[in-house]
Amino acid sequence: ACNRDLKFRFLLERSQALGFDYLATGHYVRLQAPEGQPTDNDPGTQSSALSPQHSVLSTQSSALSPQHSAFRLFRAADAAKDQSYVLYMLQQSELARLQFPLGALTKPEVRALSRERGLITADRPESQDICFIPDNDYRRFLREEMPASIRPGPIVHSETGSVLGQHNGLPLYTVGQRRGLGLTSHEPLFVTSLDTDSNTLIVGPSEAVLRRTLHAAGVSLVSGAWPAEPFRCLAQVRAHAQAVPAQVFPEAPGSLRVEFEQPQRALTPGQAVVLYEGDEVLGGGRITRSE
């Protein structure tokens, strides 16, 4: 929500109201302009060598416009700092007014350039705080700001159905979590799902966390076109996870089903699934359920 609604939508609207042509951010991601269209973005990021001329989406469906007529988004040159996963929702109208000057640089290069220019941020420690939660303690934030959402309830074993204990509130847990459950068991137990209807935390053995299929809603595709046929690509389900082979099945507009070649761990509702072809960002959406 921070990137979508504040850093981009609000700031783009504000910059346009102030008469600026572009908004530049420090995100590590590369942007390529349509063929023949000049861009003020970092010149090192605009090479056609970034990826094949047409993406998998344009070759899989005739209903899609060819990618060389649209802005295209790519992973950063510095793979360790790449932030493309959190920018999948950017639209063509937004990309046309954005610049990402750090996309072709590594973090050490950025620090060196900052020192040369005497910027106070040159040696500032990196921050990965949650937006608007400076201490990064989202559990404290929820308890203080949304106490009604923190309701204790049962912890149930996914295979036996037995009640193992009591949780402290579903928003305080995440799929795949092992520590902090407050359980004593002869086997390691992990959160496999959260049943919000019954306020029940479901736990089970490690293999119970594996899923092969996810469903996603609120899907946004960088090209702006919607595929008419299934297509193969790479799918990434966490910010620092590896993108892995999958097949994508378009459903209703804005919804997708993603089937992985291999079972994946902790496909968590609420997290994003982002689709790639090589380094190119195709789009993504919010995971609603997995199976």
How should each PLM-predicted stretch be described?
Residues 1-44, 68-282, 286-290:
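Nucleotide-activated chemistry modules centered on ATP-dependent adenylation/adenylyltransferase
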Residues 46-68:
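Intrinsically disordered, low-complexity repeat regions of secreted/extracellular protein precursors
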